[in-house]
Amino acid sequence: MKVIVGVTSWKKRISTASLTLKSILEQTVKVDSIELNLDYENFPNGRDDLPNDIVALEQKYDNFHIFFEDKDYRVWLKSVPSVRRHSGEEYVLFTLDDDCTYYPNYIEESLKMLDTHASCDAMNTSSNGIAGEYMVYRSRFLEKCLPYLTNEF
């Protein structure tokens, strides 16, 4: 099963997002795709508006990709484009924030927890209990939501 990480950022925070991205890229389990989903509203010139260190990550790591959307989905930008991009595939999607770093075994331990609860389709993995802060979703759950996400946005 694929492991995908969806992350987003905006112009006021993009300068520090490389620290977060590096912590995801250096996990004990290699992620199949780390997708930085951005919007043209915040980055009208695409990659030209991004810090050099973030663009360099895309060149260095074959599993790190930068995508630009015409519409700003706000918090949903870290998930909706990735769900659409991988429609029909079997995967686990982590939606992570751009303003923190993750322990090196964060994804590995989260996957173990998800495997322990095979019937669980969505899991909050935040340390402070705030629902939705860091989420892990199975594709079977997201596929059910996709028509609503498509119509909503």
Where are these regions (language model features)?
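Conserved nucleotide-sugar donor-binding
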Residues: A131-Y148
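A short, conserved alpha-helix in the catalytic core of glycosyltransferases
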Residues: E152-F153
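Residues at the starts of beta-strands that form the adenosine-phosphate
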Residues: K2, D32-S33, V92
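Short, acidic, metal-binding catalytic loop of nucleotide-sugar glycosyltransferases
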Residues: L21-D32, Y40-F43
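Active-site-proximal specificity loops/subdomain of glycosyltransferases
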Residues: N37-E90
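Short beta-strand-to-loop acidic/aromatic patch adjacent to the donor-nucleotide binding site
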Residues: E89-D99
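A conserved hydrophobic helix/loop-capping motif in glycosyltransferases and polysaccharide synthases
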Residues: I4-K12, Q27
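Conserved donor-nucleotide/metal-binding helix-loop-beta segment in metal-dependent transferases, i.e.
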Residues: P104-S127
